[in-house]
């Protein structure tokens, strides 16, 4: 992507080193902002936001383990939140400075955990459509999608980019109203080309293995949320089943800056000028 610089760092997990890839924007001496994507996505989701922030911030957008350009893990059972947190901790140590955190869904969960730790380098936290409580019903929906038998999207092979775009317009309709150009970019960024010329989604299809045969329970992180002593912002898709209205209201009552995005579910794509400007204003406050 023009304006970005690719990079990677080593991190230690389960007795060996892997590499985590990222794209970096802006002046390396500027205040750092770390943007962490959702479960089946990658760091390219933040291109528009990163480009908009790059005049003021150093923006770093990693690919989580098993996604994008980052290495796949030997043991698929390691594709769990605590190991993503560990890898991201290595990235924060590499950055070596106080850092703002923007996290969508899984990226926000990792942000809550890291921001609650003693001595955290995270100084501001933006949560995109995720909060300290996630209902089991929504987690079951995600599990069922991820481990679907037969035509699982994790295993699907696509003949061309048009078929990928049609697939993404269906499964990611909750991202909100996107332009044709935005959908086309999402398709390009979401896939890798296979040796036979077909395309597959740009992640290790085994990322769903920890979910297989598992019946999710409610996730309650209010104790962690209450330990976070930094400025917080929360963005909610108005029809989201991940970030419920009661949770959103309780986060606002605790002092979080709040933005609700109409005609959007899980999760806002952060491509809209209103969303980008709200985040920028929060980071600059």
Model-found features: residue ranges?
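Alpha/beta-hydrolase fold catalytic core
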Residues: 1-33, 55-57, 96-97, 274, ...
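Active-site loop/oxyanion-hole signature of alpha/beta-hydrolase fold enzymes
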Residues: 15-16, 48, 60-103
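Conserved HGGG/HGGXW glycine-rich cap/lid loop of the alpha/beta-hydrolase fold
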Residues: 23-72
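Conserved hydrolase catalytic core segment
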Residues: 97-139
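A catalytic-pocket lid/entrance helix-loop region that shapes and gates access to the active site
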Residues: 131-159
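Alpha/beta-hydrolase
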Residues: 161-230
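Conserved loop-alpha-helix segment in the C-terminal half of the alpha/beta-hydrolase fold
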Residues: 227-264
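Catalytic histidine-centered segment of alpha/beta-hydrolase-like enzymes
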Residues: 264-274
């Amino acid at each position: 992507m023009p304006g970005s610089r690719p990079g990677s760092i080593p991190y230690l997990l389960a007795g060996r080193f892997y590499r985590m890839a990222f794209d970096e924007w802006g002046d390396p001496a500027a205040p750092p902002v770390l943007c962490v994507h959702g479960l089946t996505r990658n760091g390219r989701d933040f291109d528009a936001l990163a480009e908009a922030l790059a005049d003021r911030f150093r923006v770093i957008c990693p690919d989580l383990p098993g996604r994008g350009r980052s290495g796949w893990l030997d043991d698929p059972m390691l594709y769990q939140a605590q190991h993503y947190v560990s890898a991201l901790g290595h990235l924060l140590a590499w950055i070596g400075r106080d850092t703002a955190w923007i996290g969508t869904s899984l990226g926000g969960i990792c942000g809550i955990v890291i921001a609650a730790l003693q001595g955290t380098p995270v100084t501001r936290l933006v949560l995109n459509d995720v909060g300290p409580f996630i209902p089991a019903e929504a987690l079951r929906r995600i599990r069922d999608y991820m481990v679907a038998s037969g035509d699982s999207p994790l295993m699907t092979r696509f003949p061309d980019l048009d078929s990928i775009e049609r697939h993404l317009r269906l499964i990611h309709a909750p991202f909100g109203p996107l332009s044709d150009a935005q959908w086309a970019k999402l398709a390009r960024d979401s896939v890798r080309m296979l040796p036979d010329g077909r395309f597959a989604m740009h992640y290790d299809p085994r990322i769903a293995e920890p979910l297989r045969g598992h019946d999710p329970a409610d996730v309650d992180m209010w104790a962690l949320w209450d330990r976070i002593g930094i400025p917080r912002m929360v963005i909610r898709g108005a029809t989201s089943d991940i970030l419920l209205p009661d949770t959103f209201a309780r986060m606002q009552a605790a002092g979080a800056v709040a933005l609700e995005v109409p005609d959007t579910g899980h999760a806002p794509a952060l491509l809209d000028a209103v969303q980008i400007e709200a985040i920028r204003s929060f980071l600059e406050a």
